[in-house]
Amino acid sequence: MKKVILILFILSIHLNIYSQINPDNIEIVRDHYGVPHIYADTDSEVAYGYAWAQAEDHFKLIQEAYLAGNGMLGKRIGLKAAGADFLTQFIQSESTVNDLYHTLDAKFISLLEAFTEGLNAFAKKHPDEVLEKKLFPITPKKILRYTQLQLFISN
């Protein structure tokens, strides 16, 4: 009986972490400064709502950043992006992220996945604002590649 209870407990935690996102449960309220405050039932829904709010504010900038982090900015702006695209290759961000991705905490990955769901849903609803179709769908690994580029440049 104790084993059954333990299994049910672990299963309930697992289901809570990997719960489905219901956009209807997410409320984005902006204060008088325009700062988004996201209200939702789960952390994943908050991450989804945060991504949506960020996209509402500066979807173009987000896309250009992720293009840079994934060695694709040159497709958008041409030779001016050669430096960023080179750095992405130089720091071997793709292989680094692929090699270390499995070491990340499952909860962190689930929040990254929820964030990407929010960005991808925004892109789907606003296809005319998508700069480079090959960037989509955005994945957690694409976000991490951009993060690695940011860290490299800032150090």
Model-identified regions with their sequence ranges:
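Bacterial Sec-dependent N-terminal signal peptides
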Residues: 1-21
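Substrate-recognition/specificity elements adjacent to catalytic centers across diverse enzyme folds
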Residues: 22-155
